């Protein structure tokens, strides 16, 4: 993944100021949070999950489902919200999911999700913030 093609860019020092140490480890150093460790795993209100680094809309809560993995899981991203690349780390080939606006690592996508897409976007909760839908 070429870091300089994203609309939002920062130096490493700037990212370290913007993000918490845990967010930096996951979003910029491609780490993974412990399963079940993020409160957003249990978020059920209507709203939008956005990138913690730049505010890009990533997933709508209506696409979130309980996968039993310990990470927030979604079957469909917001159009244009995420991009993917091949991740060959850890001795396996996976599809990495990153923010389309700032390139931050979000998680991975797997072909074992529910209909209609059959996809499971397995996302590190700490890489997102939740914005509740406006009350009508």
Q: What are these regions, as identified by a protein language model?
A:
Residues 1-5:
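Accessory (non-J-domain) regions of J-domain/Hsp40 co-chaperones
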